Amino acid sequence: MASGKHHQPGGTRSLTMQKVSLRVTPRLVLEVNRHNAICVATNVPEFYNARGDLNVRDLRAHVKARMISSQFCGYILVSLLDSEDQVDHLNIFPHVFSERMILYKPNNVNLMEMCALLSMIENAKSPSIGLCREVLGRLTLLHSKCNNLDSLFLYNGARTLLSTLVKYHDLEEGAATPGPWNEGLSLFKLHKELKRAPSEARDLMQSLFLTSGKMGCLARSPKDYCADLNKEEDANSGFTFNLFYQDSLLTKHFQCQTVLQTLRRKCLGSDTVSKIIP
């Protein structure tokens, strides 16, 4: 499995590759840092300019600084099936969601950078086709340097998220040469089409395919909800938890109360793992 070593071609390797290639995507990726009694989960800074040019040098320096920081705990992420990600809602039970969320701290700088790029993708408020292409190119290079199951999982997931942004925002409309995108997250395509539909049909279809009550209520203000959780639970945990992210197409799930509860619990109490796929 994911030993971090290069795998030789063969039946076992092919079967494992097929398993990794299932429609499972790493989502809600944030950096987690702890200092004294403060725990912070935050998006990775925007290491790109208005044209979408990726600042690889500063991004790499940021990742290396995290690797040697005693305050850095890892990247929090959750693995979601394509059918579970409904844009504004999650079609998954809380106990399953909790089991899927991990605090990931790889020993490889390239895997660290792939996580950082995933966080940047999800938090991009106004993504451009130039940025999507640059990020995919960088991910391709990083994956080629690792060539293990974790890098494959992160690469496939990031490519799916980039493809989702490109398709949802029509970023490649009129392009002479289409990029190497896949279909993206399927329910985001439905969400996009329903925005154009008559209101009666839209409401019915959204209730059938894009709404789930499994994860409970949404928070009016994620920041205020986290503050309330701190008041209730600080006496037990000894930590104050803070969340920072950009409100974007791919970060709507941070408005879910159960997501915030699980995120806080995992960031404060989870042991880190060095492999996503053991």
From Swiss-Prot:
HAMAP family: HSV_CEP1. This is Cytoplasmic envelopment protein 1. The keyword Transferase does not apply. The lineage of its organism: Viruses, Duplodnaviria, Heunggongvirae, Peploviricota, Herviviricetes. Plays a critical role in cytoplasmic virus egress. Participates in the final step of tegumentation and envelope acquisition within the host cytoplasm. It is found in: Virion; Virion tegument; Host cytoplasm; Host Golgi apparatus. Belongs to the herpesviridae cytoplasmic envelopment protein 1 family. Keywords: Host cytoplasm, Host Golgi apparatus, Virion, Virion tegument. InterPro entries: Herpes_UL7. Disulfide bonds: none annotated. GO terms for cellular component: host cell Golgi apparatus; viral tegument. Pfam families: Herpes_UL7. Interacts with BSRF1 tegument protein; the BBRF2-BSRF1 complexes oligomerize and might play a role in tethering the viral nucleocapsids to the host Golgi membrane during secondary envelopment.
